[in-house]
């Protein structure tokens, strides 16, 4: 399970150094094999260990290519999916087209989200966090049953 937000730097070749605390799990559970794709709802990237991505891929394969919305989701997620391998130094090379999509330059936030990571431009990440907090503070509608059960 991946959790927490960590500031990492992309080097001049577009590689990011994966924090040590995640490397053992990625090597043990995925042999360092990852898949990176775009997030279709936010200006960030999604980074999955290969076994987790294969579950997503299986779900995508069951969508209908005849349904325009389902086809669009397939096209966006699969069309941008790029395999990357954790190298001996614990780095991942993020494809240029993906870096460009998310506006990633040097300082990047690696955000754990249970079974995957999100990769954000640092400034965009902090802006999103502020927007999310503001949205939560202004909620006037009833919480879903699942959120009501979440006691923090």
Curated annotation (Swiss-Prot):
This is Transcriptional regulator MraZ. Its main location: cytoplasm. Coiled coil: none annotated. One of its GO terms (molecular function) is transcription cis-regulatory region binding. Belongs to the MraZ family. Negatively regulates its own expression and that of the subsequent genes in the proximal part of the division and cell wall (dcw) gene cluster. Acts by binding directly to DNA. May also regulate the expression of genes outside the dcw cluster. Residues 5-52, 81-124 form the SpoVT-AbrB domain. GO terms for biological process: negative regulation of DNA-templated transcription initiation. Forms oligomers. It is found in: Cytoplasm, Nucleoid. The keyword Transcription regulation applies.
């Amino acid at each position: 399970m991946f959790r927490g937000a960590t500031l990492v730097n992309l080097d001049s070749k577009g590689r990011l150094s994966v924090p040590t605390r995640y490397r053992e799990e990625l090597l043990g559970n995925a042999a360092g094999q990852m898949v990176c794709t775009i997030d279709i709802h936010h200006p960030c990237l999604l980074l999955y260990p290969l076994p987790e991505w294969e579950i997503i891929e299986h779900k995508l394969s069951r969508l209908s290519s005849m349904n325009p919305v389902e086809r669009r989701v397939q096209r966006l997620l699969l069309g941008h999916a790029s395999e990357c391998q954790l190298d001996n130094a614990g780095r991942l090379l993020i494809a240029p087209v993906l870096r460009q999509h998310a506006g990633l330059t040097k300082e990047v936030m690696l955000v754990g989200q249970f079974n995957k990571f999100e990769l954000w431009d640092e400034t965009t990440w902090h802006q999103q966090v502020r927007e999310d907090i503001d949205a939560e503070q202004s909620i006037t509608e009833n919480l879903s049953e699942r959120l009501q059960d979440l006691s923090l």
